[in-house]
Amino acid sequence: MTGRMTGDDAIRRKIEALATTLTLPTVKRALGTLEGEHPSHRRFGSDDIMDIRPYEPGDEARRIDWRTSARNGRPMVVHRQRQVTSRVWMLMDTGREMTGSCESGEMAWQVAANGLRMFAALSLRRSDDISLVCADSASITRVPFHGGFAQFEHTLDRALERPWNHARNMDALLDYARRISDRNALIVLATDEHALGEPQLATMRTIARTHPMVVIDVATINPFVARRRAVADADTGRRLPALLINAVSASEVDTHRSYLAAQLEAELQAGGSTLMRASSSEAMFRTFVHTVSISLARTGFSTRPATVVHARDTAGKAGDRA
């Protein structure tokens, strides 16, 4: 238990340092859809002057800057840059299936939560508004949050202090995401690799048409390679018989889950969404930094939302519950 807490503290320190180690131009360029406070592309903002021109028939009278007009002796229309703030919706699967174990010894919900913290660290640096939503078969709860990263961590920790005795309801969570009206809002969905089937992918394709979307996909342990731990089914509590633990079974599970992961990545990529897949918090951190770094190289200095390159933890393996 001590080792696990020490590891959790270590990854949290890395996450806290993430926003400070990335320079502001890097954050601005790399995040793409994670823009926070940034110049709006709408006209007639309220900050830096972008353009001044004489008033023409058809221009709205409210666009006239009277001080500039007085200096020029004629009506002048001023185009200004204005700052806008993006919203990030973080949707967390809190079904009991998320108590499945990963290769690192962490539970799936712990890895998923650390993935959300990584997004929050950079989003809050950009002054984004964050909405946190937790869902299982019993309820869907929007958790109030206001403040900085420390407050977000506290809010997330409190939200995850639960008995974890209700099954997941991914359909309801995706339906919640589908009803988010702000089409400029980024949706970050955190779940494990067993949650998304064809019906869910169909809904996600619909969401991806209207919203930028990132899926945090946690790979759980392969039960046929967990030799030092007794693996049990999360729903029934039945343990895996020792006679079934062999290399052939392990290879078959790895092959099947690698295929499913590749299928999920292809589906998300086709819709312009991003997959971040890992089997531990450390692997998730590396995947996150790699994704941001490649996006940095591709997006240049543009402040418009850009599709983030897909990065997957190839070493991460999936598995059943421990």
Predicted regions and their residues:
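Exposed, interaction-prone extracellular/peripheral surfaces
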Residues: T2-H41, P54-D59, T68, G73-N114, ...
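Short glycine-rich loop/turn motifs that provide flexible caps or phosphate-binding loops at active sites
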Residues: F44
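N-terminal juxtadomain amphipathic helix
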Residues: A61-R63
